[in-house]
């Protein structure tokens, strides 16, 4: 539905989003064929026409296919590539480095890695340091887990600021992670204007006001995170 996608992108631009990322988990990428995912990215790049950075999400358990998708998206004109850690199998960090190093080296745009693993461990400071040393265009790590303040700070320290940390999971842990140095939040479109206001209030030192704004959107986030598809029935 190209017209609807265009309206969503316009909404993001009009409300001050820093970038758009698609098709990701919230956009139900797993229901699209690889060709459809490329079409979605092409529509976004063409419609945005340089008005907002576009992040192409190239998730795939096969590194070869992820590289192919990422290169197609790069050729279309995305500003950054995002790839989720393949959590189909129990992979250690050495295995994940073997997955991501060829992918990152194939790209000329920056790489964002998303680690969405509600049932297990996520990558940490040493992984970020090793991959960033090998692949300087690995610039962002999006984590989605509770109580990760020390991990976020550790990643930033281990990479000397070369890798920035983004908070996912709908923005639920945003306020507790701002003091740890996260550079932003990647929520779904519906919640982002309110979260953006709370984020800006907090970084400006208006912590109580940020909490009051955040507390109004938190029930919505909790409801939505019970199941990804619930956002379709709000």
Located regions from the model:
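Active-site beta->alpha loop and helix N-cap motifs at the rims of alpha/beta catalytic domains
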Residues: 1-120, 130
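Catalytic alpha/beta core domains of metabolic enzymes, predominantly
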Residues: 105, 117-229
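A mid-to-C-terminal "edge-of-domain" accessory segment
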Residues: 230-234
């Amino acid at each position: 539905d190209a017209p609807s996608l265009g309206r969503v992108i316009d909404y993001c631009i009009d409300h001050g989003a820093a970038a758009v990322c698609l098709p990701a988990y919230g956009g139900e990428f797993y229901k699209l064929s690889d060709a459809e995912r490329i079409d979605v990215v092409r529509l976004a790049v063409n419609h945005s026409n340089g008005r907002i950075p576009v992040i192409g999400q190239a998730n795939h358990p096969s590194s070869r296919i992820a590289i192919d998708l990422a290169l197609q998206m790069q050729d279309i004109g995305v500003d950054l590539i995002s790839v989720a850690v393949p959590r189909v199998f129990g992979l250690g960090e050495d295995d994940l480095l073997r997955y991501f190093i060829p992918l990152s080296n194939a790209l000329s745009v920056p790489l964002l890695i998303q680690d969405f693993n509600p049932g297990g461990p996520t990558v940490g400071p040493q992984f970020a340091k090793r991959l960033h040393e090998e692949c300087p265009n690995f610039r962002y790590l999006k984590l989605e887990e509770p109580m990760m303040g020390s991990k976020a700070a550790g990643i930033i320290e281990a990479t000397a600021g070369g890798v920035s940390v983004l908070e996912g999971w709908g923005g639920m842990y945003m306020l507790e992670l701002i003091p740890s140095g996260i550079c932003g939040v990647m929520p779904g479109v519906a919640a982002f204007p309110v979260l953006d206001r709370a984020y800006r209030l907090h970084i400006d030192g208006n912590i109580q006001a940020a909490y009051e704004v955040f507390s109004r959107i938190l029930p919505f986030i909790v409801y939505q995170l019970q199941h990804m598809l619930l956002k379709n029935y709000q």
